Structures are given as structure tokens and as C-alpha cells.
Amino acid sequence: MRIRTIGLFIGAALVVGCAGTPGPGDAGYPYNVDGDYSGSFTVDGLTFTGTMQISTQPGGAVTGTLSLNRPVQINGTIDGTLTGDQLTVGIKYGSNPATGCSGGTVEGALTISEHGASISGPVTVVDCGEMLDATINFSR
């Protein structure tokens, strides 16, 4: 009986020890970003509005799409990494009717609110070879 009790105790300790705290992409992680977000992207005094559809994969990889629709249509793909409450993001977009350029990039470190309700922060845009400071502010 004593050996059985010790075995049950060790088994319970292993289960508790292996459960651990969820990491990026795991169910229950407080900063996962998943779903549809709407908001603004402000660059050089011009505010664009639109949507992002994103998801966090196991290990913290983040993928998705960006669709800005006002004042012009710009579409891009999102790739990033979630660490803690920070999303290091890279966005590649196609044609920009506002500048006439055939595409550009956006990079930055965004802050995620708890439960992934909002995504915001400064980014750098490279469009037509010019670097511009910008701000992203999206929420569910």
C-alpha cells in the first residue's frame, strides 16, 4: 500500500510539474492575437483605416493579412513573432495608390493588450525607398 501511495504522489507531481504556464500560441496564453481586428494606420500625417486577420501559432509565430481600405486600398501579408506582450512584426504590401509605388514594407515592435484585445505601437514604413515613421492601432 505504501509503494502505491508513493507512486500516486510521484505521478501527481509529474502532471503538475509538466502542466506549466502556457506559452505563445498555447491555449490560455494571455497575449495571443487571433481573429479579426479593425483600426488605423497613420503615416506621415495620413490615417488609413482597415482590418487585420491574424493568428498565433504554437511557439509564437504570427501570420495574417492586412487590408487598408480608406482612403485607398492597400493589401499586405503579416509575419511576426510574439514574445511576452510584444509582437515583432513585418508586413509586406503590394501596390500603394497613394504614392504610386509598387510595394513596400512595415516593421516594428507592437504592444499587445492582455487577452489580445488591442495591438498598437510605432512602426517604420519603407515605401519608394523612403523610410517613414508610422503608428498602428487596431482592436477587436
List PLM regions with ranges:
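A near-ubiquitous, low-amplitude feature marking generic local secondary-structure context
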Residues: 8-9, 37
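C-terminal motif of bacterial Sec signal peptides marking the signal peptidase cleavage site
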Residues: 15-17
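Central antiparallel beta-sheet cores of small beta-barrel/beta-sandwich binding domains
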Residues: 27-116, 120-140
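Repetitive helical segments and hydrophobic/amphipathic motifs
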Residues: 11-13
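Bacterial N-terminal signal peptides that target proteins for export
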Residues: 1-8
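Bacterial signal peptide processing site
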Residues: 19-22
